[in-house]
């Protein structure tokens, strides 16, 4: 007679579709900071994140709203367009290089990896700012 359940418990963030733990573990094994790019409905966010036992530590954070405040981006323009994503990535890359980081690994989360899209536009900005991130040239957007 069988006892117990055959169900396998699924982690909450995986069940909600927020985290791919297999991909996250691969990124963490590299022991390099992660250049996290997230595109929401209103803006682009770029962060430089390092792993810690108590939780991830964000060392640099730049969002599309920072373009308005610090860099004079026109208020009526989109904060999630390809050009805005490039500028957010460039600002994050400059801040990361200024803080002493020289390398990172791109973390796009569960976003679709569309070549030439907003995520890779932010990647191009980070690379142009001097941050060394492994990538293929075919995914970057055109000039």
Model regions and ranges:
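Positively charged, low-complexity, intrinsically disordered RNA-binding extensions
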Residues: 107-143
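Short, flexible active-site loops
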Residues: 73-78, 104-110
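Acidic helix/loop or adjacent segment enriched in Glu/Asp that either coordinates divalent metal
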Residues: 73-97
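N-terminal nicking endonuclease/strand-transfer module with a His-rich metal-binding environment
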Residues: 11, 18-20, 92, 102-103, ...
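Intrinsically disordered, Lys/Arg-rich N-terminal extensions and targeting peptides
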Residues: 1-56, 60-61, 65-71, 137, ...
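Beta-rich strand-turn-strand
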Residues: 96-103, 114
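Histidine-centered divalent-metal-coordination microenvironment in nucleic-acid enzymes
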Residues: 43-49, 105-114
């Amino acid at each position: 007679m069988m006892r117990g359940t055959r169900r396998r418990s699924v982690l909450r963030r995986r069940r909600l579709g927020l985290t791919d733990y297999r991909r996250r573990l691969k990124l963490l094994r590299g022991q390099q900071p992660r250049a996290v790019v997230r595109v929401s409905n209103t803006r682009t966010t770029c962060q430089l994140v390092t792993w810690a036992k108590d939780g991830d530590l964000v060392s640099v954070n730049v969002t599309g709203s920072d373009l308005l405040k610090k860099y004079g981006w026109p208020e009526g323009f989109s904060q999630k367009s390809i050009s805005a994503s490039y500028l957010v990535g460039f600002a994050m890359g400059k801040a990361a290089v200024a803080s002493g980081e020289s390398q990172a690994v791109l973390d796009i989360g569960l976003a679709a990896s569309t070549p030439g899209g907003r995520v890779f536009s932010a990647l191009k900005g980070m690379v142009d700012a001097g941050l060394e991130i492994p990538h293929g040239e075919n995914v970057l957007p055109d000039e």
